[in-house]
Every structure is written in C-alpha cells, then in structure tokens.
C-alpha cells in the first residue's frame, strides 16, 4: 500500500527529529520538518524542531501535579525532550542520556533496566531499549495528536517510515533499533544509514543542480560527528548509461566519540577554572557540570558573537541561592579544548592511540581511548586504501584522481552533525584533510555546502522515501559490512592454547536489501532442544569474500560482534542430532537474517542476536 506521507525519523543520541513529505499535497512533494510538541517547563508544552533525546524519571513528589501532562496523556509520570534535558541535568541520577550509545554496547544487557547508569537504589531505571522506545513513542503520539487528529488514516503507525541508524551500527544494534520502533507502533519501516541520509538531504537541497557540483570520479567523504558517535562514509560518483550515479563504497568502524565526549572535556575545563578559584567539585556536582557544560557549549557554538556562557550548578548548602555555584565559560577555552583536543593536526599516517587493558575497569560506555577525530580519520582512509585499490574505477577520471585514490583521500567532504555548526571545527577538519592532499600532490579537497546540520538526517530520510518511489537518484551500497560465523579449527587440542577460529562468510559486503543466499560448503550439527551459540563477526574492508568463503588468517581485518544463538524446537525429537546448513537474507527493512536449514529442507530455525551481557 502506498501511504500518503513519507516520514523520516532521526533517532539521535542527543536530539531526535522528524521530517515528512506529503505526497497528496501536489505533484512535487518536498520534505519539511515536523515541529514536535514537548514539555519545556512544568505544565507548559511547546513545539520544537528537535526533541532532545533525554528521559527524566522524577522521584516521588519531585514535580507538582500536572507538571508532566501532555495534550494526549494527562497522567504522564516521566518526561522526554527539552524539560527532561534541562531539569534532569540538575538531578542526573534521574536522567537517562545517551540511550542510543548504550543500545549498541555489547558489554551490557541492553534489555535490562540499567539506566540512569549512576541511579541510586531509590531511583527508577529503564533499559536502553525502553528509553529509545519512549523517544519514538513520544514522536508517534505527537504526530497522531496533530497531523492525524481528524484523520485516523494519517496515523504515523500506518505511514511509510524511514528510520536512520549510524552507518557503523552492526546487525545486532540495527535489530534492537527495529525492535524499539516496532514497540512504539512503527511497522512499515525501513532503515537508512545516517551519513547517506545527510547526503540525500544535500541532493534534495540542490535539486537537479547537484550534478554541477560533483563529477565522475569524485570521492565524497561524509563526516558525521553527532552526539554519541563519529561516522565516516565514502560515496563515489560514477557513470551509468550516460548519467551520474552514486555508490556508497565504505563506512568506518563504530567510534563512540562525539558531542558527549566534548561535553565532558568542556566540563573538566570549567571544573579546572573553578578549582583555580578555590571551588572543588565532588562526583555528583561533576555530573551536574557535564550537563550544564553541554548547554553552555551549545550556546557558544550557536552564536558566534558570544564571548562567554554562564554555568550554574547546585552547591552543598541548604539554601538554593547560597548553595549555587556559578562560572563564566570563555569561548576561547571551549574552542581550544575542542579544536586541539578533538581535531588535532596530524600526519596522514597517524594512528589513534589504543587503550592499555587494566586489571580492573569501571563499567560504562566503551568510549574510544583517543579523542582525536582526525587521527581516527587518518586510520579510516589508510585502512580503506588497500580495500578500494582493486575496485573498478570510473572512466575518464582515473588519471586525474590517481594520487588521491592511492591513499583513499576524498575529493570533497560533506559535513553533518551539530558539532560542525562551529566554524573553527569545520575549518580545522578541512585544513587537516588539505594538508594530507598537499603532501600527496593531490588537488585541494573542497567542502560541499550542506543543509541544516541538525535536521539534515531526518529531511534526507524523508527524501529517500520519495526516492524509493522513483522521484530521485538512489545511492547504491547494500550492507556496510561482510558478515561471518566463527568456526573452530578441527586441529587437535593443545593445552593452554584455544583452537584457532576461522571466519565463514555468510553475507558479502554490499549485499542488497531484498536478497538472500545459501552458504555453501559448511555443515553444522545441532541438537534439538539445546541452545547453540555462534560467534558472529564482521568486516568493513573485506570486499571480495563470497558466501561460503572460509578465512583462516583475519587478524586486524575482521572484528567480533555480538554472538548469535538458536534453539532447535521440536519436542518429539528432543536430543536428536540434526545436520543443518546456513542461509542468509537481507530484508527490505535492511535487517540481516541468518537461518539454519535442515539438510532435508523441511525445517528451518532463525538465529537471534544475543544482546544480553557478554562475559
């Protein structure tokens, strides 16, 4: 069924947004932003372009009756959005933030009530999955209370929805995102990678003129630095039947590095300033400082005329006024810590620092050890150089781009994410890239003028929905990784040494949505009624492996992901040994499925991702 509305939802780590195109409003529908009603002060609801991805779980009697009331829910006992972010920052043990980052953390049970992470025994907790569901549910309810108020057929649950995810999200994290969306009532769903959505927004913004901004052979880097993650994507411009075409060639590894890290760095900078003045913060005050620093940072980055921004946190005194701690955060301090700390000048051959493993580590989000985004960029481009070297290159520009291709340098960059609203950060990023281009004797790398950095992903997702209906150019790409099942070697056991693990390819890099394949060559023996676990792996750089390819030596090229589990049901056959082979499918939604099929072809069982805590 073709729906009237095509809807794009950006479920962001820091902010979420919705854009839509009304296909019933004319012959040339355009994506536009839906302003989301939300609580901004106790008892006050207003519309905003963005829904801050924060969940406030108040304690008993912390808010007056009706303070959290919404037009569609008079009895709401929690809040998401602007008020949740602003007030919750003052009581951080009752504020859920970065739920999307926790959703992709394989070291915790993502369906267990673990957030807020530092909540006390008396505080309420929710799971990362539940928090993301609540953000999406709020968006669904807000849409239905406005767009679909008088027309039930316009309810969001029955519209075509494009939901974005980081390009670096693995298959398990994508599955959990789909689960959250379906729990919020969204069934007519397709996933889209956020950097691709940003590129679609650029295409939509330029219309047919985009063909005058790029040429055959161009390699566009989409640099997407959001609240929780840094995503790098390479998109190539090629030619097909005389027309320009686009192909997503590569995505980077999952980097838990973004605005959250920057907020913490700014908070420590402010705390150091207070310490010099004789005020030392305790652990609880540092949590408050982190949220207050985020607001101050966003004020400074949003208004280039501001020279400083105020920070206020609660002290330890009984009096609210007398116990207040205030600090003026200078713009110069913010720009110094962000520019030099997160976008340092470095050589093209630079590698990010790796963390030393310690005997005891505090549980928390697995942030990267090195905050230097430019060093991670160098690693990404150099790692992709060899992977891209053997591909079929577009004709006509091979010689011109040879030097850049030899080191996987892009010819253009498209910025995305609120971080890049700050001119100094964009300029430093581009200057570092151009220093590398100069050293490689390549042409200068240009910046493509993007759309609104906060809303581009949602708008691009809505535009992609129109593309799916034949109204624009589509970026080809398929799966962003090749996927593998781990197979232990059959060699004799050696005391003290684990059996070598081989990687069996079950889904090739770039496997398209709506396709499926048998995995030849390998047979597994499973027992009916017993749970079997498969080690699951992925690679962003191995492009030539086909289903059934068995890789012996894959160190540094393939990474271990969340395992997959399957239980063969069938009570009459309990305990019976069943030989099975694997079959893979990428659904139209963009979800990878791996199935076990009995050799006689009569039965099959789906493997599920084990998203519980990994020991």
Each model region followed by its residue ranges:
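Phosphate/ATP-binding catalytic cores across multiple sugar-kinase/actin-like superfamilies
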Residues: 134-153, 201-213, 341-409, 428-429, ...
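Short glycine-rich phosphate-binding loop at a beta-alpha junction
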Residues: 150-166, 281-288, 310, 389-418, ...
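Early-domain small/polar-rich strand-loop-helix modules and first-structured segments
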Residues: 1-112, 190, 197, 241-248, ...
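Phosphate-binding loop and its immediate beta->loop->alpha context
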Residues: 31-182, 193, 264-310, 316-354
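Conserved phosphate-binding catalytic cores of ATP/NTP-utilizing and phosphoryl-transfer enzymes
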Residues: 1-4, 191-223, 392-403, 455-474
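Glycine-rich phosphate-binding loops at beta-strand->alpha-helix junctions
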Residues: 161-176, 288, 292, 314-319, ...
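Conserved phosphate-binding/catalytic loops in two-lobed NTP-binding clefts
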Residues: 184-197, 366, 429-460
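Acidic low-complexity intrinsically disordered segments
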Residues: 187, 315-387, 472-615
């Amino acid at each position: 069924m073709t729906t009237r509305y095509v809807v794009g939802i950006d479920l962001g780590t820091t902010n979420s947004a919705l854009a839509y195109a009304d296909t019933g409003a004319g012959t040339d529908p355009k994506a536009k932003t839906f302003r989301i009603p939300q609580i901004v002060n106790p008892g006050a609801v207003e519309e905003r372009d963005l829904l801050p991805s924060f969940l406030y779980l108040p304690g008993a009697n912390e808010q007056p009756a009706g303070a959290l009331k919404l037009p569609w829910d008079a009895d709401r006992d929690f809040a998401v959005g602007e008020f949740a972010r602003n007030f919750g920052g003052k009581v951080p043990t009752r504020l859920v933030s970065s739920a999307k980052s926790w959703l992709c953390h394989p070291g915790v049970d993502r369906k267990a009530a673990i957030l807020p992470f530092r909540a006390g025994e008396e505080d309420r907790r929710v799971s990362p999955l539940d928090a993301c569901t609540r953000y999406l549910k709020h968006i669904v309810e807000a849409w239905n209370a406005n767009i679909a108020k008088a027309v039930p057929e316009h309810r969001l649950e029955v519209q075509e929805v494009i939901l974005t995810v980081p390009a670096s999200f693995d298959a398990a994290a994508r599955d959990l995102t789909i689960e959250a969306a379906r729990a919020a009532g969204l069934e007519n769903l397709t996933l889209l990678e956020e950097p691709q959505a940003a590129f679609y927004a650029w295409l939509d913004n330029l219309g047919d003129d985009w063909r005058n901004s790029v040429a055959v052979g161009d390699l566009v880097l989409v640099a997407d630095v959001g609240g929780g993650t840094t995503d790098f994507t390479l998109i190539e411009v090629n030619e097909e039947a005389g027309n320009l075409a686009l192909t997503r060639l590569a995505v980077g590894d999952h980097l838990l590095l973004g605005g959250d890290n920057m907020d913490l760095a700014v908070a420590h900078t402010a705390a150091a300033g207070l310490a010099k003045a004789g005020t030392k913060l305790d652990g609880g005050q540092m949590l408050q400082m982190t949220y207050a620093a985020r607001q101050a940072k966003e004020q400074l980055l949003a208004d280039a005329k501001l020279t400083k921004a105020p920070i206020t946190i609660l002290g330890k005194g009984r009096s609210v006024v007398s116990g207040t701690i205030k600090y003026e955060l200078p713009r110069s301090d913010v720009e110094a810590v962000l520019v030099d700390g997160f976008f340092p000048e470095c050589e093209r051959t630079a590698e990010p620092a790796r963390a030393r493993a310690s005997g005891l580590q505090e549980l928390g989000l697995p942030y990267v050890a090195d905050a230097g985004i430019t060093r991670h960029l160098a690693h990404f481009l150099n790692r992709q150089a060899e992977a891209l070297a053997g591909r079929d290159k577009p004709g006509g520009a091979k010689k011109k781009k040879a030097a850049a291709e030899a080191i996987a340098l892009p010819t253009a960059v498209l910025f995305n994410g609120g971080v890049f609203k700050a001119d100094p950060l964009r300029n430093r990023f581009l200057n570092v890239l151009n220093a590398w281009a100069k050293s490689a004797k390549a042409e200068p790398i240009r910046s493509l003028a993007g759309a609104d950095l906060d809303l581009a992903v949602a708008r691009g997702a809505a535009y992609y929905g129109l593309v799916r209906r034949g109204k624009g150019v589509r970026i080809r790409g398929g799966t962003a990784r090749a996927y593998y099942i781990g197979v232990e070697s059959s060699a004799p056991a050696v005391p003290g040494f684990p059996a070598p693990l081989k990687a069996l390819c079950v889904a090739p890099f770039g496997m398209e949505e709506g396709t499926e394949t048998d995995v030849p060559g390998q047979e597994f023996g499973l027992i009916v009624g017993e749970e079997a676990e498969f080690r699951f792996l992925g690679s962003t750089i191995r492009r030539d492996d086909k289903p059934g390819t068995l890789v012996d030596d894959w160190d540094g090229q393939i990474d271990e992901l969340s395992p997959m589990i399957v239980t063969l049901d069938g009570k009459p056959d309990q305990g019976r040994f069943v030989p099975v082979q694997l079959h893979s499918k990428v659904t139209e939604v963009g979800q990878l499925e791996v199935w076990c099929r009995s050799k006689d072809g009569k039965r099959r069982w789906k493997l599920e991702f084990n998203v519980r805590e990994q020991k």
